[in-house]
Amino acid sequence: ITLLWLMVAGLLNRWYKAKLGLVLGISYAMTGLGGACFNFIGQFILGPNLLTEPTWRDLYLFYGIAAAILSIPFTLFCIRSHPEDVGLKAYGAEIQAGEVISSENLELPGIPAKQAYKKWYFYVLIIAGCLFNIGGIYPQHFTTFYQTVCAVDASGVAIPDLMIMSGTLEGCCMIGMAVGKVSIGAIESKSIQAALIFGSVAGVIGLLGIWYGGFNKVLPVLFFGGFIFGMLYPLVTTALPYITRLLFGEKDYDKIYSVVLMPVNLVGAFAASGLALIYQGPGWNTFFIVGIGVAIMCFVVGSVVVKFGVKDYRGDKVQSAQAA
């Protein structure tokens, strides 16, 4: 996951001077779309009996072969690190008359990494990223919620007709992620503040829908809530790399963003277990209340880092970055 976030964001940062937010959104939306498709395929391969070992083996074999066929040829033959490697400039970059375009003449604007690490808002950005990622971890537990709350009767016995749909909630969430990535990418290209509002509000509304729909077995509300909540997840995949470039520029973007991602993903690893402890202990109600609080804090902390970081950094013409 870390390699996916870092390499895609770093590559697109080099190729797009303008419209970076939109392109990030479209690119990461494909991961959500693929996840949704594979999730629906997987639930039918597994069937109602989720504990049968051979079906899991077949499923992972299918996923592995599909991933190899779809990714390796394009990685080997289609990807180039910099546009200058093939005699081009980044989309939206100005070209001067008589300019020689090559990787040897490449000089990107921005703050050096060592200087960025001394900025207080760099660490607030990490906190914001951690909150974004905690929100993104929530869908990992939605299938458990569905199987233990929605797909069982009053005595706790599984309902086969509902159990076979156990991947649908997470699938709807992944579709929401795909839509949200494009939406947030397009919005942040105009206003990063509006993108933060969009993602946080979607998180709150989505959790409320899943909470109500699951306990009351109202499947349309449940699945729609999953779709809406999926639009929170792009804050970590689409908004975080965009904010990083907005605050620190392109010069040492890869170095800075990689350092940001280390604690962000570390917190995500602990959050997966921590969220499980919440619903296994205090219960699912506490799980959803905490999630709503996280969604709200995503907006609050994200707004703080954008407001003060943008004021401090003017080397890359913030007005241009906001329109990029």
Please identify what each model-predicted range represents.
Residues 2-16, 235-248:
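Intracellular juxtamembrane helix-capping segments at the cytosolic ends
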Residues 179-192, 279-280:
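Helix-to-loop junctions at the C-terminal end of transmembrane segments
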